[in-house]
Each structure stands twice: as structure tokens, then as C-alpha cells.
A protein has these predicted regions:
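Active-site-proximal polar cores
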Residues: 1-28
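Short, conserved turn/kink motifs that form compact alpha/beta structural patches or helix kinks used as
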Residues: 27-116
């Protein structure tokens, strides 16, 4: 399956860095340079996704990606800038990655502190 060029949207992948403070709380930052990628981004829908994510479904995006910059087991919880600029905090987080022979299905969850 090939993704149509006209359906692809430019987004930016930001790899996360996790450190801990004195009280062992996680501090997530995105210090690395953003990586430009093109993917098909759509609103998440469907019965299966509704059963998995429930009321969070309205904050989810379903994406299709072809390439090697996002990989299953490596990029979960990294940030994606969909509606914000590449120099801002990511507005979405990678929730899951499913690898198929010709593409990857990626579920994004909107960060709580963002709108859209």
C-alpha cells in the first residue's frame, strides 16, 4: 500500500529525554532537533478504537506513515508537532505504533495542556 502524496501532512517528530528530580518525578523534555516527516493524519474512529480508548478517542489521531524515522519499540511516547510549529512543545504524543509490510499505523494522543 502506497500513501498518496496529496494526503500527506508535514509534521515534526521530537524525541523525548526523561530525567528525574530529587523526588523521583519524571521530567520530560524535547532537547533534540525536530525531524520533519510526512504522514497521513486523521481523526481516530471506529468500534475497536472506541473500546480501547473510550472517552479519550476524541483526543486521538490515527496516522499512516511510510519511512524509517519512527519505529515500533523505539518512538512510543515521543512528541509530534501537528498543529504547532517545530520549535514549540509537541501537541501530540505517540501512543502506539503498529508495523505492517508497507506502512506503520500510529496512534497519537493530544497532550492535556493543548487545544485543537
Amino acid at each position: 500500500m502506497r500513501l498518496r502524496e496529496r494526503d500527506l501532512q508535514t509534521v515534526y517528530l521530537k524525541k523525548r529525554n526523561v530525567t528525574h528530580d530529587e523526588e523521583a518525578e519524571e521530567i520530560v523534555t524535547y532537547p533534540f532537533d525536530p525531524i520533519e516527516i510526512r504522514m497521513n493524519v486523521q481523526a481516530a474512529s471506529g468500534t475497536v478504537n472506541a473500546q480501547i480508548y473510550g472517552s479519550k478517542l476524541e483526543t486521538m489521531k490515527a496516522c499512516k506513515y511510510q519511512g524509517d524515522k519512527i519505529n515500533e519499540g523505539q518512538n512510543e511516547l515521543d512528541g509530534i508537532c501537528v498543529y504547532v510549529g517545530k520549535d514549540e512543545e509537541p501537541d501530540f504524543t505517540i501512543k502506539s505504533i503498529q508495523t505492517f509490510s508497507a506502512h506503520k499505523n500510529i496512534m497519537l494522543e493530544r497532550n492535556d495542556n493543548r487545544g485543537s
